[in-house]
Amino acid sequence: MIYEGKAITVKALESGIVELNFDLKGESVNKFNRLTLNELRASVDAIKADGSIKGVIVTSGKDVFIVGADITEFVDNFKLPDEELVAGNLEANKIFSDFEDLAVPTVVAINGIALGGGFEMCLAGDYRVMSETAKIGLPEVKLGIYPGFGGTVRLPRVIGTDNAVEWIASGKENKAADALKVGAVDAVVAPAKLKEAALDLVKRAISGELDYKAKRQPKLEKLKLNAIEQMMCFETAKGFVAGQAGPNYPAPVEAIKTIQKAANFGRDKALEVEAAGFVKLAKTSVAESLIGLFLNDQELKKKAKHHDEIARDVKLAAVLGAGIMGGGIAYQSASKGTPILMKDIREEGIQMGLTEASKLLGKRVEKGRMTPAKMAEALNAIRPTMSYGDFGNVDIVVEAVVENPKVKQIVLAEVEDVVREDAILASNTSTISISLLAQALKRPENFVGMHFFNPVHMMPLVEVIRGEKSSEVAVATTVAYAKKMGKNPIVVNDCPGFLVNRVLFPYFGGFSKLLGFGVDFVRIDKVMEKFGWPMGPAYLSDVVGIDTGHHGRDVMAEGFPDRMAVEGKTAVDVMYEANRLGQKNGKGFYAYETDKRGKPKKVSDPEAYELLKSIVVEEREVTDEDIINFMMIPLCLETVRCLEDGIVDTAAEADMGLIYGIGFPPFRGGALRYIDSIGVAEFVALADKYADLGALYHPTAKLREMAAKGQKFFG
């Protein structure tokens, strides 16, 4: 053994060839933490010191190659002063450069996922052989940063600037065939042949059949683009990517600027340019928020995994109530491998559900994400029925009938009598108390809420609601089923609106107050979209449905009368009374026309403005900042209350619920991280400025206590 550590070993194979193997002890994946980096330094030094070594192959002892840097460790480094962070980055890069400069040929065998620092390690090798099933990429822009271990330097010199810009700015994962096509790897082989192929390649380089020094040289030099080519390539790319990423996500454009700045430098000077830009991005609030989201997501996955220990396997599911929602749930279940019965009392409902599922599956085939054979298999896994005849073998039933407590109770009691005693019942309700619905059941311990968001196939969140009598097995089984469906489940406790809708309606309450002061809803939409929301509150109301919002508002007002009760008529009331229900009937705050692609397109409608005149209580001048505060303060304070009331267990879950469920701007990190970014004391003072607007704007006693103590929700 030439070197033996806890993350890396270097051992002799044959004919002067050694194998550098990444296999981090005690972990399921390889990642670049401090230990691995230190051992890579020691491994490279050991190889350099051994004159008998003629070639190196790099392998992994895990199912993945290397998933990237250990964010939990490196995020602490981002708090260091700039010069220390730059120095640390360059020190790490020196390890990769020393590996690249070894006096012998190097071949990297990519057996599985190689992302971020993992792929940057691959780029430092002379040759790369990739398994057919592996994926490679540089996803750092999704964390608000860009590659920091030489990715912006080596990738353009390996696959060309245009391809590198696309890979780095998009952060996408790339399959083996695509990687081979652009020259990111030199060969693609079956998984079982990978090591053999790597050995063959290194032997050919040792024998001189392949000129590894010539292969290495372009990575050490400046980019082969003249001034005009550089200008055309970089300026066009910056313009296009800026348009795609928007002003709130600077990392993709900064990555292109870095490649451009380093274009005329050799490797070592180019790495200095990369390090300087990397540090600049690492210090931004966007990076802090997006890295925070990544860590929150990891925390959620760990919690969801914990549920697996007691969850029952779901081999057959059922959905009650077909239609668009039922069809969406059936599609999601069947397309992810769980057969499902779809029951409705009406033939039209069944037909609508099947049409929805078929349409969604057809779109996947059109986009090349599914074969026609797989589509047929998924459609066959949806079994439409108008009776309970086959329900005896069902493991979980998702009730998705009309949002009416009496109807839901009747349907749930009915299905409870025909399923096995251990079958789980789950209600897809958005506002109705799970404990209330459970009163109709003989086995309330087997009952939970399972709130899908519309459209089911697009929205990643599922709220799993624990009622007063819900068992942990019922909760765990529902969480496991949601994960199996490809969703991100969050467990919340029962209350009106649960987490997401309870937080969303105070946001709409702020919108209602602005309209009462005569503020133009189009202006409000523009301000909130600029703030980072995918759509403003007026447009969102139309998309959700004014009738849905009206009903939800009444449920929330009944649940929290101290702050959500409504005095007098509101915009939602006048729209509802005028039968302006939003996109579903072509008119709400906006009117809707069909565009060339058959999609609804919003246009201004004088009738809406006329209706809204009746609910103006006083004309008030407000700034754009006021609009943001009117909307965001109630949302943030209600999120705080949900955490304090134990509706959600952690700040991470609360924030991820809002990101996944209502499209909270990811670059702001979630409601609680948004408060942290302002400062808890500063946020409390800001809320107090709007105290005259009512209880929705009044901070809790505990939040005031946090402000006084200088505490934060994160860190």
From Swiss-Prot:
GO terms for molecular function: 3-hydroxybutyryl-CoA epimerase activity; delta(3)-delta(2)-enoyl-CoA isomerase activity; enoyl-CoA hydratase activity; long-chain-3-hydroxyacyl-CoA dehydrogenase activity; NAD+ binding. It catalyses: a (3S)-3-hydroxyacyl-CoA + NAD(+) = a 3-oxoacyl-CoA + NADH + H(+); a (3S)-3-hydroxyacyl-CoA = a (2E)-enoyl-CoA + H2O; a 4-saturated-(3S)-3-hydroxyacyl-CoA = a (3E)-enoyl-CoA + H2O; (3S)-3-hydroxybutanoyl-CoA = (3R)-3-hydroxybutanoyl-CoA. The keyword Oxidoreductase applies. One of its GO terms (biological process) is fatty acid beta-oxidation. It comes from the Bacteria. One of its GO terms (cellular component) is fatty acid beta-oxidation multienzyme complex. Residues 1-190 are annotated as: Enoyl-CoA hydratase/isomerase. Substrate binds at D297, N501, Y660. The record marks E120, E140 as: Important for catalytic activity. Keywords: Fatty acid metabolism, Isomerase, Lipid degradation, Lipid metabolism, Lyase, Multifunctional enzyme, NAD, Oxidoreductase. It holds the Pfam family ECH_1. SUPFAM superfamilies: 6-phosphogluconate dehydrogenase C-terminal domain-like, ClpP/crotonase, NAD(P)-binding Rossmann-fold domains. The active site is at H451. Its EC number is 4.2.1.17, 5.1.2.3, 5.3.3.8, 1.1.1.35. Transmembrane segments: none annotated. Involved in the aerobic and anaerobic degradation of long-chain fatty acids via beta-oxidation cycle. Catalyzes the formation of 3-oxoacyl-CoA from enoyl-CoA via L-3-hydroxyacyl-CoA. It can also use D-3-hydroxyacyl-CoA and cis-3-enoyl-CoA as substrate. In the N-terminal section; belongs to the enoyl-CoA hydratase/isomerase family. This is Fatty acid oxidation complex subunit alpha. It comes from Ectopseudomonas mendocina (strain ymp) (Pseudomonas mendocina). The gene is fadB.
